[in-house]
Structure formats: structure tokens, C-alpha cells
Amino acid sequence: MKVSVTKNTIQSLKLDAVAFPISKSEKDNALKEVAAKTGVTVALFEKDFSADESSLMMLYPDLELCAFKRVFLVGLGDKPGLDACRSAMASLAKKVKELKLATVGVDLSGAKALSETANDSVDYIAQTAVEGFHSGLYDFNQLKTNRVKELKSGKSEDDEPKQAVEELVLATDAKILSDVKKGAETGDIIATSQAMVRDLVNSPSNYMTALDFAERVKASGEKHGFKVTVFDKAKIEELKMGGLLGVNKGSVIPPTFSIMEYKPEGESLGRVALVGKGVMFDTGGISIKPSSGMGDMKADMAGGADVLGAVEAAARLKLPLEVIGIVPATDNMPSGSAQNPGDVLTTYSGITVEVDNTDAEGRLILADALTYVKETYNPDTIIDLATLTGACIVALGETTAGLFSNNDELAEKLYKAGQRAGEKVWRMPIWDEYDKLIKSNVADVKNVGGRSAGSITAAKFLEKFVGDHSSWAHLDIAGPAFPGMTNGGGSGSTGFGVRLLVELMRNWK
């Protein structure tokens, strides 16, 4: 979808539809302005349009006055903020998609006033609008068409999701044109990177193995200009990454270890390492999961996909920050060669782990990756993302990720980035008292700590593999990354984490 910005009068736009965002507090005045611009009669519909958040009404303009064919009134609610803007634009996109309209405009002449209400900038309002519209348009349609090869190779010239809308036009005033254009361009980059992540996470495991994922990483690096190195099984064995190899023992598909390196052309503000869990399909291994909802376990690589999306977006936005992305990838399968409960693994760090439960596999592969990135790249900050625990969903639901960190400043930055980006996180404790829950009698540590504090003990386990690094955060994205993943709800991937990470990196100091 093409995204463009214009200062031309709204009436002159030859489009299938034009939308007017309207808040409840400004409803009366806004409707009068819409009437003046479109020729619609306010008295015929003003009582029927509530202006509640994401509410919609379609009208037909005076075609002698306007070049566009339809009018949409889009509700922003009482005190519209960034989340309301995203939600409203997503609602609009869904309706436009349903009606199969090809060209759509949005009147953003009021972006300045909206930015003041939302306490943010004009460019961020435009960015948010584009992100929301892209989100509402998204469909996972690759396996319903002849696009299977494109999905696996990532090398098609048209490898973005197929969308009904051909162009989104943001119409605004000349005074804020440059700000709206800047925000629209940024929003388009972030949203398309996030859509790519959603495609990867929604892909069935027979189309997205560890090998397939590595190929997608290579294709993205080649297209967007960041370096990619992929370790094969022989290299992983040479490095003695016992966590990744242990999880992979039950699979006939070899593991991969993908490394992404983005470096800015000019001076760098620092080096950030992103580590993502890449369990391509999680049966639980010998500690096998119930069959109900197991198909959603194709989404257990969402953290790894997020890392690819964030690195890709950083490269496309040309951020002045060095970004290292690491994704250990494998599936977790039961077989005669699979690891057993009670086995002891030696990780890349040399720390030994008692595998008390083979379904706690994500932390095992992350353990190797965390130590590797710390020792190899010495980053200023390490952030890992993983659909790690059902316990985090119990604690925070499906809208919020768990945040665990050994650095108060980093935790605060992530919290604020999440609030602004609409991908919220909430900090959880990682006090030393929890260490006793993962104490092992036969190894240095156990990979699970029992029923209580499951998300916390998982974070405490990971903490051991960053050692003395003083700026680390773990994001448990099990709830928001794939709503319904633990109950067979089948809601599909959200791409949660991409906007959060990009927002953090764009404001790096």
C-alpha cells in the first residue's frame, strides 16, 4: 500500500472515500466542518453518530462539491490519545477492506489539535494513524493464494501482505505538512516491518522451520542492508551451545543461530543487543502439552520474529544506533532421541542445567544466546523477548507483557516506550529470594521452579546467563504476542514488541 501526504483541499481528492476523525468533545463543531467540506446534511445523522472510540458512520457526499465518493466519520472517544487514534484507524481500515475500496483519504487537518489533546507531537499522530490503518488491513493470506514460495523465500519484489487498499492519503494543512509526512513515512516503515513479523508468526511450522526462518533473516539483511551470519548445527556443536542442542535433540530439523548486525553510517549512540526466542513449534517435548490448542504453538517463535522486525526497522529508519539481533531457533519435539526430564545440560556459559521439565525449553536456548551476545559483542544493553510462560498471562492477561530487569533506568525507558507505542509492559520483581525455587541438587540450576511465581523464576533463570551485565531486561510476551495462544483462541499474531523496541531505540540517549 502506498502512503502519501498532501496539502491539497480535501474536496479535490479523487478517492473512493475520505475519513474524518472526530472526538466527542468536538463533535458538534467537527460535524459542521464536515458538512461544509462534503455537502452532507448534519441534521439527518448527528444523533446517530456517537463519536465513541472506533465508532464508524458512512455517508455519501455531494458529488458536485467533492471528488471522492464516500464519507466516513470515525470516532475518537472523549479525550483521544494515541491508543484511541490507532484503534480508530484500525476500525476504519477493516471497514474499507470489507467494502473493497482501493483509495482512501484521511483528513488530518486537525492533527495539531489532536497532538495537544494526546500530549504528543504532530508527526507522532501521523505515525500512529498509519500504524493503526496498516494493522486493521492486515490479513494472513499467503496460504490462500499462490504466494507460498514468496512466504518461504522472502525474495519476492512484492513480499508485503496483499492488501485491498492501494493508497492511503493523509490530507493536512501546509503549516504541518512536513511533520505529517515525516510521521507517515516512519509509521509506514514500522507497520510494514511489524506485518512481516505477523506473517512469520502466523506461518504453520511446516512452512516456517528453523532453516526457513534463517533464510528469511538472510533475505531481510540483503534487502535492507544489515549483516547476517547464520550458524548451522556443526558450528553450534563446535561452540558447545548445550541448551539449544538439548532442545533440538528430538527433532529431525537442525537448529540455527541467526546473528543480525546493523551499524549506522555515521556516529553511533551505543550498542543494543536484542535476543529472541525462536522455538518454531513447541510440543513440550517429552513433557508433552495437551493437544487442545497445540496448533497455536507455531507462535512460540514470536520473540525471534520480533527481533528480526526490530532490526529491519532500525535499518530502514537509519537509526544512529548499533543493533545486534540474535535468534536461536529450533522446534521442541518428542522422539526416541529427545532429551528427558532429569537430564543435565552444559550451556555455552559452562553453567549446568537440570532439565526438570522439557516444556520449559525457551529459557534453555535463550541461555546460550544471552551469554554469547554478552561475551562476543559487549553491548551497552541486552533485551530478550520470549513467549516464555503461561504464568505471565495469568498475572497480566493478554494485553500486557511482563518486564523483568536488573536496571531501573532501562525498565523505566521500556515502560514509557510501551505506553507511547501502545505495547504496554509492567515490571515484575526479580528479588534474590526467588533463586531458591530453581536450586538443583544435581546441577547448578533447574529450568523450572514449581507452580508458584512461574514467570519470575523463568526470569531468574535467564538472569544467570547475563552474569554481571548491568543493563539487561527480559520481556515475557506470551500474552500479547498471540492472544488466545494458551486456550486455542486462534486470534493470530499481533507483532507485539516491534513498535515497543523501535520506540525505545529511536529515543536512545
Curated annotation (Swiss-Prot):
PROSITE patterns: CYTOSOL_AP
Gene Ontology cellular-component annotations: cytoplasm
Keyword field contains Cytoplasm: yes
Binding positions (Mn(2+) 1): D282, D359, E361
The protein's Enzyme Commission number: 3.4.11.1, 3.4.11.10
Major enzyme class: hydrolase
Keywords from the named record: Aminopeptidase, Cytoplasm, Hydrolase, Manganese, Metal-binding, Protease
Binding-site residues for Mn(2+) 2, renumbered to this chain: K277, D282, D300, E361
Annotated Pfam families: Peptidase_M17, Peptidase_M17_N
Cellular compartments annotated: Cytoplasm
Gene Ontology molecular functions: manganese ion binding; metalloaminopeptidase activity
CDD domains assigned: Peptidase_M17
Keyword Transmembrane helix applies: no
Active site: K289, R363
Catalytic activity: Release of an N-terminal amino acid, Xaa-|-Yaa-, in which Xaa is preferably Leu, but may be other amino acids including Pro although not Arg or Lys, and Yaa may be Pro. Amino acid amides and methyl esters are also readily hydrolyzed, but rates on arylamides are exceedingly low; Release of an N-terminal amino acid, preferentially leucine, but not glutamic or aspartic acids
SUPFAM superfamilies documented for this protein: Macro domain-like, Zn-dependent exopeptidases
InterPro entries, per the entry: Leucine_aapep/pepB (IPR011356), Macro_dom-like (IPR043472), Peptidase_M17_C (IPR000819), Peptidase_M17_leu_NH2_pept (IPR023042), Peptidase_M17_N (IPR008283)
GO biological process: proteolysis
Function, in words: Presumably involved in the processing and regular turnover of intracellular proteins. Catalyzes the removal of unsubstituted N-terminal amino acids from various peptides.
Entry similarity comment: Belongs to the peptidase M17 family.
The name this protein goes by in its record: Probable cytosol aminopeptidase
Organism: Chloroherpeton thalassium (strain ATCC 35110 / GB-78)
